[in-house]
Amino acid sequence: MVKNKFIIILVVVAVILPFISSLINFYTDWLFFVETGFTSVFTTTLAAKVGAGLFFGVLLFIFAMINLHFSNRAKFPQTNIFVEGRNIYQVKRDEAARLAKPLGILASAILAILACKWGAMQWQNVLLFTNMVTVGTNDPILGKDIGFYLFSLPLLEMLKIFAGFTVLATTVLVGAVYYVRGGITLMERGAAIDVKVRKHLAVLIGIFSLTVAAGFYLNGCGLLLSGSSTFHGAGYADVNARLLTLRILTVLTPLAGAILAAGLWQGAWRLALLPPILVIAVYGIGIKAYPALLEKFKVAPNQLALETPYIENTIRFTRLGYDLDKIETIPFDADVKLTAADIANNDATIKNIRLWDHAPLLKTYSQLQQIRTYYKFFDVDNDRYLVNGQYTQVMLSPRELSYDDLPSRNWINERLIFTHGNGITFGPVSRISKEGLPEFFVKDIPAVSLADIKVTRPEIYYGELSNEYVIVKTKVPEFSYPTATGNINTTYGGKGGVPVGSMLNKALFAARFRTEKILLSSDIGSESRILYYRNINERVRAVAPFLRFDGDPYMVVADNGGLKWIIDAYTYSSRLPYSKPLKGGINYMRNSVKAVVDAYDGSLTFYISDPDDVMVKVYGRIFPELFKPMAAMPDDLRKHIRYPHQFLQLQAAMFAAYHMTDPKVFYNKENLWEIPSLGDKPMEPYYTIMKLPGEKKEEYLLLLPFTPSKRDNLAAWLTARCDAPNYGKILAYTFPRDRLIYGPKQIDARINQDSFISQQLTLWNQRGSEVIRGSMLVIPIEKSLLYVQPLFLAAADKAGLPELRRVIVAYGDEVVMEETLELALQRIFGGRKAPAGSTQPTPAAMKASSAELAREAMSIFERATNLQRQGDWAGYGEELKKLQQVLRRMAQ
């Protein structure tokens, strides 16, 4: 008896504990939403989950119980049960009935609970359906507004699945009850089914046929989302064979179900067998066989003529899905010759060419500005600021706290003392010290500003590395930063976090984070607050799980000296007709939201950056208190929004094919582009400050070049504008197709083939240095192109500090390598004075440059001599011209 009680207690505890844990997480999540001010988001989501769960669960339970009620009321003379293929024994009717009823209720309850959980997972589809808007664009085949596909179809498909499952599960339950109670008897020659059972099953089969018919109807809509044709979406065979068949099946299936039900009702088994055979035959012929024959014998020989309307559909809707239809295409004649005057007139562009690559700069920042081992630079972000009155492109990296690198890891250190990172490192993208190191506008701890950028609130409590909770305003002083004379402490003064001073909250958070220390610590007082969801990516996802967030959050210094994170967010769908999907199935995407997180107090704000997006319109109706218009964003933050490079890369991958709007050109891939690669890695979009052709001033842009498919010359360059009032406008500048415009890979090959550069690289490698070749940047100036690539030197070991030692510049047929960008431009164009603030080469550097020129002259002379001996007088003459150019540069 005691043993049984102990087992019962264990079972009860095993059931209750997960429920209590979920309840604690639920309540502490509610406290998080109270802290952030988004309780309406929490309650709306909760109501949708509970409502959808109850709807599906209760509906299934009621349907099952009604059918079980009829099955339990039926009277049968006896209950026969067939066991082990031969033995048949009988049980009394009342004993079978007593067994069937509770088991049926239990099974229905279990199925209802599963339906509740499944239904709760459909909360987003429910909210989209109940708040849908009309888009105003119809699909070209069925004429439905695309809002039907985006907002209605997902829920309708879920309802169809639920209805089919409910009927099938109920049929199985009812069949089991009838079997136990004797309505179905298994004999050696088959099954004997009572007339009452047949009639009941006939009704269920008739209902099930309606769900199958609904499935065929929805499958017809789904053809526009399929990839069964040559081009994404419904093609000729889909529209003229499969769609017609599905329409026939939508009507035929209920009729077949009615005939099948009638056959069961009357016991006419032959009549009952014919309808499903007919439906299967129509499906096999109309969906599989006939379309395949149509494709092979009619479509394939005349594919372009027959598929042209459907190619137009996929072009149109793919461009709509990825916002490509707003890209403006502009011819770009790159045959104009640049002069020294052109370079001087584009001084702001030249001064903002990004020489510092992210990876070398991150390593350099880590070694120069990490200060202590427990600080870490996770990433380097690109932005632009008005620095001392000049529009300047900068690199910024937050100095976050790395708990993995704390010298002494214990609960008090990790949760009460070391609570935050401190400050930023901030400098221009193009300026280099004499030692080949970056210059700084803001550096050190406490922050030292060498420009008019001030950081007055440097503490970073919320960041990309802040993955654990901390407790602030405790009796233990928080560590702020180290100095030569000792550590400086601080006390949190922000509004972030949840009060944890009460015994109840201590107990709740101790349970949530599975540590008794929160409950027992004497350092936690009445004013203490617990900060959780501190990872900014996790924080925004907790509030808006229906959005996708960019993987590259970036930090901004506000005018008041505070630090803010800006995270790009995307609305998306996989339900846009005819739009080609990505690998994950998404075929509609917009960068419609900018999320801002305060690094000090964790406050969250979501701004709508694309009010024309239909998805964000619906989410705005669902969560009216979540979003604010872009006009509400403070000016000091709005001037730092930028077009996300990950989104432009995605758009570029699609635009490479879908810039072709002529179906014939698209079909033949006559003008297919691709993103150029250097090595195995495709080029990524990069930010730069430059003056667009025809514009009067420089602006902050995101740029990416294209090459023709399987060729290396340039075809176009794509740029997204980041500054107001032109934010979000994308331009595609196309090069003439009748002449060669060097592409990145061709320039890279010319660099590798340059004898002087290759010899210098070999020499550095032989001396134990690692040569790191930076990103190849294509810089449009006026109507010409400059190619710029920085070279970094670092010691071959892992601790090597990357130093920017050379800059390669290519223009036209010339490729030069110099210590600075200024010197490289002077070699090509001559006569340009270095702008104020740029680093001038020292006499030693000039001497080294002269020595390099001398070595280059000797190399050219040796090649000329060899060509003379071989009798190659044309090659000999070319080498003499090169030698003459080098001697002129030496004479400057």
Swiss-Prot record:
Transmembrane segments: 6-26, 50-70, 103-123, 158-178, 201-221, 248-268, 271-291
Domain of life: Bacteria
Disulfide bond positions: none
Tagged with keyword Cell membrane: yes
Cellular component GO terms held in the UniProt record: extracellular region; plasma membrane
Keywords: Cell membrane, Membrane, Transmembrane, Transmembrane helix
Bilayer topology: Multi-pass membrane protein
Family (UniProt): Belongs to the UPF0182 family.
Stored PANTHER family: UPF0182 PROTEIN SLL1060 (PTHR39344:SF1)
Protein name: UPF0182 protein Gura_0902
